[in-house]
Each structure stands twice: as structure tokens, then as C-alpha cells.
Amino acid sequence: MDYKCTRCKRPVEIDYGYTGIRCPYCGHRILVKERPQSSIKKVKVE
């Protein structure tokens, strides 16, 4: 999965086997957290 570095805004490929990686362009530390699947609520449009 690709992630955009918050410092240099370049795309960084993330390996979910690691919890922390660094941006190869600027060295900014990226912490990877698994997020639970959110449920999508359907709403009726009137």
C-alpha cells in the first residue's frame, strides 16, 4: 500500500510487516497502525 509522507508529500510504499519505517526521501519517521474496518452506514436520501 502507498502512503504519502506528511513532511515531503512523496508517495512511500509501506510494508505492513514493520510498525515503523522512514521515508526514503526525507528520513521522516512513519508509524504504521492497523485501523479496524469501519462500517459504512447507508442513509436514505429524501
Curated annotation (Swiss-Prot):
Cofactor(s) listed in the protein's UniProt record: Zn(2+)
Database matches in Gene3D superfamilies: RNA polymerase ii, chain L
GO terms assigned for molecular function: DNA binding; DNA-directed RNA polymerase activity; zinc ion binding
Cofactor annotation remark: Binds 1 zinc ion.
Reactions it catalyzes: RNA(n) + a ribonucleoside 5'-triphosphate = RNA(n+1) + diphosphate
Subcellular location field: Cytoplasm
GO BP term, example: DNA-templated transcription
SUPFAM superfamilies per the UniProt record, alphabetical: RNA polymerase subunits (SSF63393)
Protein role: DNA-dependent RNA polymerase (RNAP) catalyzes the transcription of DNA into RNA using the four ribonucleoside triphosphates as substrates.
Quaternary context: Part of the RNA polymerase complex.
Protein name according to UniProt: DNA-directed RNA polymerase subunit Rpo12
Organism, scientific name: Methanococcoides burtonii (strain DSM 6242 / NBRC 107633 / OCM 468 / ACE-M)
Organism phylogeny: Archaea, Methanobacteriati, Methanobacteriota, Stenosarchaea group, Methanomicrobia
